[in-house]
């Protein structure tokens, strides 16, 4: 059977390679990322260490080894590594982690947590993350492989975590991704002027400026 790679074994230079959405990062003790507005949705899995995080959902929360949180696009997030921290970030734009039926069910039938707490990394999720570390270290990755890993993560979260657990992921996603700020963050690089951005979103320029203020 002929190779689909057509003899090109350098995956980083393959035409099918895309930006990697799964990143393995180690922060040294004392590393501080000031409060900033997230330009992507991401799930932060803390494999080792302790990290102090601060956001609207996780105000002054100590994230410990074996826990994870989600931060939605447009939300403000700050972090401080209390010890050396080993992390895996999974970044995404659209909430592809759930089927529409499950997402809508949680939105309608399951209330958001009164107090948000990090979720535990169960063994099945740990296996997925350990496997991801071993061969997803490059800046780029095969498009088909990344698609499979997205689906695998979606399956693990959807199959092994309850609706109540997933509510702490779904509700922030819905809150931020349906908003005006999310639209601006996702699209401002695609245009050159405010007028073009307003037109892209179906706004009149006066309405766009009023909402943006």
List the predicted regions and their residue ranges.
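Basic/polar phosphate-binding segments, predominantly the helix-turn-helix DNA-binding elements
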Residues: 159-163, 191, 195-213
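Short, Lys/Arg-enriched N-terminal segment that forms or immediately precedes the first helix
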Residues: 31, 161-169
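A short, N-terminal "cap"/entry segment at the start of jelly-roll beta-barrel domains
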Residues: 1-17, 135-138
